Amino acid sequence: MGASGNEKHYVKWAKEATDAQGKRVAGNAKVSSPRDGTGNVYIAIVSTTAQAPTEEEIQIVQEYINTKRPVGANPVVSAAESIDVTIVCEIHKTAGYTEETVKSQIQADVQAHFLEIAFQSGVISLNFFKVSNIISAVNGVSEVVDLTINGKKDSITADYNKFFSLKGVIISVTE
């Protein structure tokens, strides 16, 4: 205890919580503090892999925050609600790179972006052009020929306590 318990503190505490093996359990968090006099502070978390956390991970974060919270605060930790995302793309591959290596790197880089944007302030946008740029920047990709996000060639948005969950990246490759 001792901190003021502002929203940044709750995000920091959520990200500090570790399991019995010392591994962080929350990749990011977003906080809502209604100004209604109840002392309730709602903390929605995602896992370190940008997926919905397990009940155990939620409990670990709840218990950790309970040790840090200021007197009078009532933190309530929950899983953020996921918005499933499927990305379908067609790329031209550069010679000298294996198809599997390129696909694996695209998947990893897109997943890293999902975690990075998981809980930006306000409405979160999964920007169509940013995703295209991420794929284009992968070593072995010479061109992104076609791209859709959830069947559309457009950005999508998520409100408070929601995050994007990457359900699949379907990649067709030509040289």
Please place each PLM-identified region on the residue numbering.
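Carbohydrate-recognition loop of C-type lectin domains
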Residues: 1-124
